[in-house]
Amino acid sequence: MSVFGLVGLQDARALQRLMESNAGYAVRIQGHGVEPGAAQEALTALPPNAVAAQKRGYGLWEGNRLLAFADVIIGWPEPGTAHIGLLMADSERVGEGLGRRLHEAIVTELRGAEGLCCLRLAIVDANADVAEPFWKKMGYQPTSQVAAHRQGTVESASRIWRRKLGCGAEASAGPN
C-alpha cells in the first residue's frame, strides 16, 4: 500500500530513479533523456518571483520506493493559486492509478488551506498527447494562456490549464 508524504532533498536518489523510469517524458519536453542531477533540479528549481518556502514536493511512497511525485508551488503565480510544475508516476506501474491517487491526496491536502482556490499547470504541446487526457480526467480545463517552451532541443508551446480547488464556503461543498 502506498503512503502520501513530503519529498525533499534527502529523497533525491528515489526521485532520480523515478525520473529515469520516465525517460520518454524527458525526451518529449527537452529532446534527450534524464540527466544526472535532474531530481535535485526538480526539488530546488523555482519559477520567477517564487521563493523556496512556497515549494512543496509531494509523493506516494511504498517503503523506500517513490511511486509518484508532484512539484507544487503555493501562491504562484498569484495568491490563491497553487501551480503543479510536474506530476510523474512510475512507468513500471502504469494503470494502477498512482497519478490520480497522488493528485487526489494533493487536492485534499491543499483544499481550503492557505486561502487556495485554484490549481494551475502548464502542458507542453510536445507532451500534450500523453498529458491532456489525464488532466481532463482530473477536472482541469485549458485557458487561453500560452507561452513559449524552450528546453534542451525542444521548442514548443506551453498551455495553461486550471481547475477550482475550493476556498472558504466552496471548500466544504465537496469536489469541483
Language-model regions, residue ranges each:
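A generic structural signal for beta-strand entry/edge sites
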Residues: 79-81, 118, 158
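Short hydrophobic/aromatic beta-strand or adjacent loop that forms the aromatic wall/cage
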Residues: 55, 155-161
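Conserved active-site alpha-helix within GNAT-family acetyltransferase domains
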Residues: 100, 125-144
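Acetyl-CoA-dependent GNAT
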Residues: 2, 6-92, 100-105, 109, ...
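Glycine-rich phosphate-binding loop
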Residues: 97
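Conserved beta-strand-loop-alpha-helix junction that forms the acyl-donor binding cleft
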Residues: 94, 120-132, 149-154
